[in-house]
Amino acid sequence: MTLRSPVEFQDQFDVIVVGAGHAGCEAALATARLGCRTLLLTLNLDRIAWQPCNPAVGGPAKSQLTHEVDALGGEIGKMADRTYLQKRVLNISRGPAVWALRAQTDKREYAAVMKNIVENQPNLSIREGMVTDLVLGDNDEIQGVQTYFGACFGAQSVVITTGTFLGGKIWIGNKSMPAGRAGEFAAVGLTETLNELGFETGRLKTGTPARVDRRSVDYDKLEPQPPDEQVSWFSFDPEVWVEREQMNCYLTRTTAKTHQLIKDNLHLSPIYGGFIDSKGPRYCPSIEDKIVRFADKESHQIFIEPEGRDIPELYIQGFSTGLPENVQLAMLQTLPGLENCVMLRPAYAVEYDFLPATQCYPSLMTKKVAGLFCAGQINGTTGYEEAAAQGLVAGINAARHCQGKSLIIFSREGSYLGTLIDDLCTKDLREPYRMLTSRSEYRLILRSDNADQRLTPLGREIGLIDDRRWDLFQTKQANITAEKERLYSTRIKEQDAVGKEIVDYTQQKIKGSIVLAELLRRPGFHYPDLEKFQLGNEELKPEEKTSVEIEIKYSGYIKRQQTQIEQVSRHSQKRLPPGLNYMAIETLSMEAREKLTQFQPLTIGQAGRIGGVNPADINALLVYLETQLRRSVSP
């Protein structure tokens, strides 16, 4: 139920954040650090920043998001660097645009460290409570929240980060129970309040695999997946880097017996049995989906991953399911190495309410209620990193809203988190959204190594980057610039002793002379090769050397992509008048008129990314705007 002011508030805050998962923690920390008195409300104080599925951070596209959150002053990258069990850089044999750092983290340690951080953050209060109602003012602006038991708290901004808890229901086979995740009750009431206010809500599904006792596994039958010898970092702040002993993950595979067992029991699955019809994540399918969709595959990789240093549970990645418990155990015991495994927790599917993010502006403030923001799985995403990125953006803008400042919109050409939010706000998504490198048109520019170069100046301007971090950033950028200048100006000659050595080493001629930058551009030649011939700079840090090499080696491609961005930006940043009557523009297709009226894009670029709006419609819209402009200035 929606309440109208005046309401007697138990306490008054600037910002209230509903939910203390990965989005909620980032949002609350951001608002508190920006000087807002903040209340973080959660169902369970002992489950702050819990990792209910895979305890891992990073991976393709997700690592770029994590680096970007850190570059802006967020927390998730620091958390992974403090609590990792294993780190690996994925896709290292491919180009730098798709390099992806991934960390397996200690589940309990991660939650404990984050809990300590939010508990000790100035301006931030944490309380248990289930928000069921919103308090609005006379102009439908947010003024506070009410909990299930009637406590009211006032605020100028409210951020909803409810994860899978909103109307959550977990399924194992044909059995279900209300729950946000196993062992924790669902949140009720808030969906009905949002519906009352005219918001559209829907249902999505996700799932998590079983956990098995690591003492019951035969490791001799598993293929070890060791960590990288050279540890890489998510955070650009060396102060949070913790060198620690790493652990192995392991690999096994499904067998013909696994596949047959699943086929024989498909009718018992919540999805295939017809018990639920919510859409699940396309890029993280259940094992049943894999067997059905990829029937020609004889086997699927299954990764066995530790959940902590002192935790007996192993996470069975790639084996999520909603089949009954007895079937799950039989399935697990068909995997090599797990023939005698003990299942400690069964896999389950969870369905929950979400609010399609087309009802939000790119600031993540809702279009219907000023001061109300949404972030994380309520917006239709899946993944801790996607949630953290949205939480940070929502937190920044919630703070700026109550401070009377303009809201920040991140462009898709400037960041992965801008791409993520742009997709959410302009596309009618009906399945859980996962960030992929292929979703960005500008991935060569939006690399992990330059996330600080792209976003830390903005983080400083916003107020989340302190003097120490700013000094570190400026020193790093100065070192990179100076080294590039040195490499472009230092020349070696064909007849020099070092020149002859390089020719012998590379089996490529030097015609007269060559600058070191051109040498670095050659395929197969890298910065460590310069160092072999005493032509490197020993004072540079490893991450600075990496950035220098990438910027030189791929300079042609980078310049070409920058040119493309500039060309696209000429029209894409053109703002659309608020309240524009698209239904009156007869040169637009009827579908375009309906979609533009529904989504109310802010710019031409956003309009062009809405499904059903084609290039001809965009041209017609540009012509219409130009005609209106001429009429307005003509005497």
Swiss-Prot record:
Localization (cell)? Cytoplasm
Tell me which species this is from.
Answer: Synechocystis sp. (strain ATCC 27184 / PCC 6803 / Kazusa)
Q: Which residues participate in NAD(+) binding?
A: 280-294
Task: Provide the cofactor list for this protein.
Answer: FAD
Q: What is this protein called?
A: tRNA uridine 5-carboxymethylaminomethyl modification enzyme MnmG
Q: Which SUPFAM superfamilies match?
A: FAD/NAD(P)-binding domain
Q: Which domain of life does this protein belong to?
A: Bacteria
Gene3D superfamilies the record matches: FAD/NAD(P)-binding domain, GidA associated domain, C-terminal subdomain, tRNA uridine 5-carboxymethylaminomethyl modification enzyme MnmG/GidA
Question: Quaternary structure per UniProt?
Answer: Homodimer. Heterotetramer of two MnmE and two MnmG subunits.
State where FAD binds. 19-24
Q: Name one Pfam family in it.
A: GIDA
| Any Gene Ontology biological process | tRNA wobble uridine modification
